Amino acid sequence: DIGADLILVFDECTPFHVNKTYTESSMRRSHRWATRSLNRFNSSIKYKPTYGSAGEQKLYGIVQGGIYEDLREESIDFNLNKINTFGIAIGGSLGSSKEEMYEVVNFTAPKLGNKNPIHLLGIGDPTDIWKLVKSGIDTFDCVSPTRLARHGSALIKGKIGKKNIKNNEYSNDLSPI
């Protein structure tokens, strides 16, 4: 009963170092799971949150394919033409570097069009968010902002990027971050 507003089909997120054969097998498995997830979501037993939610849940499909453009193309086609979800997430391995991640996102996002919201999985660095919104990404999720907050850091605008609010200089500071 977490009351999530946006939920995702079940998938496998492959690590960046797996080969194309494994990535393709994983993508096909994720597509089968997506179909099962959608069928369950649309079933008469559909989960209806009672609290913690702004309303009806929305299901997102997930584009897989790792760094391989032909696999991404196939997964884009699956998500746009074989299943019908509220939105589409870009998932799976986005590469082993920021450059590869930007290449994968900039290849994938424009092909998804603007009919559905586009979500990017696992990216939470503020610089990446600003850059990737310009590429057509609507929403993001990542554990890093929450993890930083648990350890006393707050993300802030500007070159510094974050501030450790546990530092002694802030112990009596009641001003806005």
Model regions and ranges:
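Non-catalytic, usually N-terminal nucleic-acid engagement modules in DNA/RNA processing proteins
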Residues: 1-53, 168-169, 177
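Glycine-rich phosphate/ribose-binding loops and adjacent secondary-structure elements
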Residues: 28-31, 44, 48, 54, ...
